[in-house]
Amino acid sequence: MNDALKTYSIGIGWFLLSLVSSSANDVMSKYLGTRLHSFEVAFFRFFFSSIVLLPFVVYYGKNTLKTSRPFVHILRGLLLFFGMTSWTYGLSIAPVTTATVISFSIPLFTLILAVFFLNENIIWQRWVVTIVGFVGLVITLKPHAEDFNPEMLYFVLAAISFAMLDIINKKFVVKESMISMLFYSAIVTAVVSIPAAANYWLTPTLFELALLFILGSSGSLILFLLLKAFSMVDATATAPYRYLELVISAIAAYFIFNEFPDKSTLHGAVIIIPATLFIIYSEKKAMSKKI
């Protein structure tokens, strides 16, 4: 194996580990959401996340937390609160694989928001593919089916919130340290969650607390794994592997919750995945032309 292939293989390996961690997050969130309210899950998740990040703040020094954009951090925290509580609630009522497929639609929402907030010019082919992708999203949600649950729309609210976070990150991440972005987001989200969590409070068991701690730590772990992956391979090279998360989620959901993806979820995935892949590669092509 030559050095280039070895580096590529290791980079993809790091990326696959991030997918496993992401799927594990959904599984833990679903399990916790069966008893604890999503507000309480969000509170503990980001409370523990801020605790885990404290040693890094101490190590890199207080200057790491200096920011000239406190309102941006507050906005990110609010979006994280809406996104994560909606996502956790959605997981409590829907299969994990459905959530995974809907998460693939986030780039579609990001593309639309980029037009309004980043003044990006979008070629007509990407608009067509985006519309096709949303058709896949509608198929996954099954709004006209007799067994349609309107609460599934919480996933859509979460996807929009995460897309807005992507827009903010694109605009400000180069102007803020990674530690400050993570720490302030965790603190703000935890604080915002307190009133809502208190209203639906159920004292977690020791096992639930352990899962909540792992959930709070995993956000930083996923970021670490992604940074390791992207230090070895181009982000675009990892795009096709992103959709292996559906396989990982399906296996985990089957053995833990006895869930199996229904036809609508699979049909939606067949449409959404090519659409988002086209958007990712066309964005890469557009960026290379600018360079």
From Swiss-Prot:
Transmembrane segments: 4-24, 41-61, 74-91, 98-118, 121-141, 148-168, 178-198, 206-226, 237-257, 260-280
Main location as per UniProt: membrane
Domain of life, source organism: Bacteria
Keywords from the UniProt entry: Amino-acid transport, Cell inner membrane, Cell membrane, Membrane, Repeat, Transmembrane, Transmembrane helix, Transport
Protein's UniProt keywords contain Transport: yes
Swiss-Prot/TrEMBL GO biological process terms: amino acid transport
InterPro entries: EamA_dom
Protein family per UniProt: Belongs to the drug/metabolite transporter (DMT) superfamily. 10 TMS drug/metabolite exporter (DME) (TC 2.A.7.3) family.
Protein name: S-adenosylmethionine uptake transporter
Native species: Rickettsia bellii (strain RML369-C)
This protein's encoding gene: sam
